[in-house]
Amino acid sequence: VKHVRLIRHGESAANAGEASLDHASIPLTPKGIEQARLVVSSFTQAPDLIVASPFSRAQATAMAVVAAFSYVPFETWPIHEFTYLEPARCANTTVAQRRVWVETYWAKSDPGFRDGAGAESFLDFVTRAQSFLHGLAEHPAENIVAFSHGQFINAVAWLIERKPHQIDSRAMADWRDYEITNHVPNCRGYMLTLHPGDSDWKWSAAES
């Protein structure tokens, strides 16, 4: 049986209400660093593989586990957060300052829409989540831990639970409701399982 522990990064500066230069370089707060340390103590055995998003806050969270299990392979996969607003427009803004832009984006409910240079569409985002599940299924490691982000984690869970037939406006609205309802706290996440010969992943809430 393949087990994948999917964990959101520790508290970041943006989570704490601070302005951020860009989506990729947001650092952890001291609280986030401590949360990452606590994740290590929750492991009862070493994983076969440690994976992290390329974004700084996920890499920093993963480093505590990498340090504890230095002999375990560590890889960076494209499981970064959904960047749906143009990064240049968001430079040096806070979550509160971006709220109107966020609401406008979701009200449009257009899966193929890209906000600008460096932004991805909802369809791009879901395709990444689908590729992640495929990559996990194909990987020889049986016990994997992956450090990612709240929206990406919920895209994975939504795909497993809802099994959408097509990514249209209705599916996009459904995912947005799902994400708001199932907020993933820092350093928490889901446990994914895949049984031999089965093509359907299962998921459950995982304590971190």
Spans of features found by a protein language model:
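Acidic, low-complexity terminal tails and accessory targeting/binding regions
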Residues: 2, 71, 82-96, 158-208
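Active-site-proximal alpha-helix that buttresses catalytic centers in soluble enzyme cores
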Residues: 2-75
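Beta-strand elements within well-structured catalytic alpha/beta cores of enzymes
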Residues: 3-7, 142-151
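Phosphate-handling substructures
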Residues: 27, 66-130
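Glycine-rich phosphate-binding loop signature in dinucleotide/nucleotide-binding domains
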Residues: 43-46, 136-142
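Conserved histidine-centered catalytic loops in small-molecule metabolism enzymes
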Residues: 44-78, 100-108, 184-208
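Short beta-strand scaffold positions
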Residues: 52-53, 127, 147-148
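His/acidic metal-ligating clusters that form di-metal
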Residues: 131, 135, 139, 146-149
